[in-house]
């Protein structure tokens, strides 16, 4: 094999198997990527520990939910919440525990993608594929900024691709079990992981070279392990359908559930096209720039001996068809949801389990990009993007107000918790109608022991759904900009509740934020012992943000 061909081949191989899969040599260079990922994670942790102020919605939700272990928590699967609970048990409900779980999940994304790509495109290509994930805005930026469940889902999606490649190389029982384990954990991380899983299973059946290797009796091992992992949560879902799917369906319909069918389909189709364009724009531009130096080779294979060329075509042909079918099947599932009128729009983040592997697929389809020069160029572009997004993470707090942007760190949740503790020392419960407010009040109390009170903090929806008994003084707190009128819903569920007062608390935004933020506090009194609430339809809180 010529040196030129080696540059375009998947990297360090001893041989190719009968199905075109490369047999890799052991390399001692893996610590390099590992050290880079560790540096990225450590930098993220340091920056997060330097932050102050309110938490974004998803992390506030973790503070609220991860106080105990349950088989299910609501509209999102429980795996991330379980991991957050473990971190809280080890380190306490603080910013470090929040950042640690996300930081490790972020690191797992890039390390798993590197290992997944290695047998497909070699070391240079694998480094480029992993670094190129930083060019996907939903992974490189939004995952840093606000997401939780989606970050873990992406790590497991990369892990599933890694497990799939390992199965192709050696389809033994242990690797089928590993594939099933990752599949089950992925479903416990985010429900839309099922789109990727369905697409991967379908693609493996449609590519002959993969089907003959993977589909035999051992495949039941993977299915069985996945079912065992997911079964406890599935049982919870069957008993709590409204809690598991009500909020998700409302979010998918984007407020258009009463719109005519054709309008829903049109909006969904336009949303899908818009999300696709936004998702691929940045990596497409980066790959076009990297490919410019090898543009003459993109239309044809590098000249090699005939036998080597046949092996390369067999290998790359099967891999290329696998990724092509993967995207066709995943997008077909989203298209079906659009045609059924289930979705009012398609959010860009919903495409994460569908298109996360696009950089790797481009490297498979365009072998010339695996060379040292274009691969190194992609690696440098990804590194610059990673450093830039890390720098923007704290900078957005101070630069945001200059362009009229307010972030969660500006919100005065800690001063609000202090004001409530001082003004209402006898309150037994604080009821909020939004998880961002509830979680941040809990977090403010955890960070400041002087604010510890006997008052429990609870979401109104949970209060109504679980029929919790209450007694004594209860505060209904609503943040400006969110649905108001908790009092009517609360009194419908607790007829014995007696209104005492209604007050406004205006607090200045913090850390450079401009303006004031208002909160409404309704004070209620319930006789002791508190009556069990009557059944009431839970109030519809604002749909949860990205996770």
Regions found by a protein language model. Name each.
Residues 69, 321, 325, 331, ...:
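Hydrophobic/aromatic-rich transmembrane helices and adjacent perimembrane loops
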Residues 68, 129, 175-191, 202, ...:
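Membrane-interface alpha helices of multi-pass inner-membrane proteins
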Residues 341-348, 370-426, 435-459, 477-520:
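Membrane-proximal, lumen/periplasm-facing interface regions of secretory-pathway glyco-
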Residues 144-150:
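Short acidic/glycine- and proline-prone juxtamembrane loop motifs at membrane-interface regions
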Residues 37-40, 129-138, 183, 187:
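Short helix- or helix-capping micro-motifs
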Residues 160-178:
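Membrane-interface transmembrane helices that cradle and orient dolichyl/undecaprenyl
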Residues 197-320, 330:
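Transmembrane-lumen/periplasm boundary regions of multi-pass, lipid-linked membrane glycan transferases
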Residues 100-120, 159-160:
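Transmembrane-helix motifs of polytopic, lipid-linked glycan transferases
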């Amino acid at each position: 094999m010529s040196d030129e061909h080696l540059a375009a081949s998947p990297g360090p191989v001893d041989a190719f198997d009968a199905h075109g899969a490369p047999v890799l040599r052991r390399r001692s260079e893996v610590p390099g990527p590992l050290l880079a990922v560790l540096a990225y994670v450590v930098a993220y942790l340091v920056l997060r520990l330097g932050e102050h102020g309110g938490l974004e919605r998803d992390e506030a939700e973790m503070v609220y939910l991860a106080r105990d272990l349950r088989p299910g928590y609501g509209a999102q699967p429980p795996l991330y919440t379980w991991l957050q609970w473990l971190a809280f048990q080890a380190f306490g409900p603080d910013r470090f525990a929040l950042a640690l779980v996300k930081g490790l999940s972020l690191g797992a994304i890039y390390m798993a993608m590197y290992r997944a790509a290695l047998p497909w495109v070699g070391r240079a290509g694998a480094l480029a594929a992993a670094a190129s994930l930083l060019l996907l805005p939903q992974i490189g930026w939004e995952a840093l900024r606000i997401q939780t469940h989606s970050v873990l889902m992406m790590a497991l999606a990369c892990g599933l691709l890694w497990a799939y490649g390992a199965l192709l190389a050696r389809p033994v029982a242990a690797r089928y079990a590993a594939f099933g384990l990752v599949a089950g954990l992925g479903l416990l991380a985010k429900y839309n992981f099922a789109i990727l899983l369905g697409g991967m299973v379908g693609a493996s059946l449609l590519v002959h070279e993969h089907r003959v290797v993977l589909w035999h009796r051992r495949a039941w091992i993977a299915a069985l392990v996945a079912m065992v992992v997911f079964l406890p949560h599935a049982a919870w879902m069957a008993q709590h359908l409204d809690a598991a799917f009500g909020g998700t369906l409302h979010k998918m319909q984007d407020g258009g559930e009463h719109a005519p069918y054709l309008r829903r389909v049109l909006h969904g189709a336009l949303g899908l096209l818009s999300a696709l364009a936004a998702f691929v724009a940045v990596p497409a531009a980066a790959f076009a720039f990297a490919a410019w130096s090898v543009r003459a080779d993109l239309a044809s294979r590098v000249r090699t001996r005939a036998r080597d060329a046949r092996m390369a075509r067999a290998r790359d042909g099967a891999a290329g068809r696998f990724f092509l079918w993967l995207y066709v099947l995943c997008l077909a599932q989203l298209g079906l949801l659009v045609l059924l009128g289930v979705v009012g729009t398609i959010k860009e983040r919903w495409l994460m389990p569908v298109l996360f592997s696009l950089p790797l697929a481009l490297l498979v389809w365009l072998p010339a990009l695996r060379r040292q020069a274009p691969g190194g160029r992609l690696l440098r572009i990804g590194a610059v993007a990673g450093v830039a997004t890390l720098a923007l993470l704290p900078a957005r707090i101070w630069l945001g107000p200059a362009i009229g942007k307010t972030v969660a760190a500006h919100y005065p949740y800690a001063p609000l918790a202090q004001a409530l503790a001082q003004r209402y020392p006898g309150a037994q419960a604080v009821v909020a109608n939004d998880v961002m407010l509830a979680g941040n009040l809990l977090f403010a109390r955890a960070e400041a022991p002087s604010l510890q009170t006997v008052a429990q903090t609870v979401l109104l929806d949970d209060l109504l759904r679980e029929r919790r008994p209450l007694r004594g003084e209860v505060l209904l707190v609503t943040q400006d900009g969110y649905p108001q009128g908790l009092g009517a819903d609360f009194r419908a569920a607790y007829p014995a509740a007696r209104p005492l007062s209604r007050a406004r608390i205006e607090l200045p935004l913090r850390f450079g934020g401009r303006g004031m933020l208002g909160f409404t506090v309704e004070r209620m009194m319930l006789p002791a012992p508190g009556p069990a609430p009557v059944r009431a339809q839970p109030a519809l809180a604002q749909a949860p943000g990205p996770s």
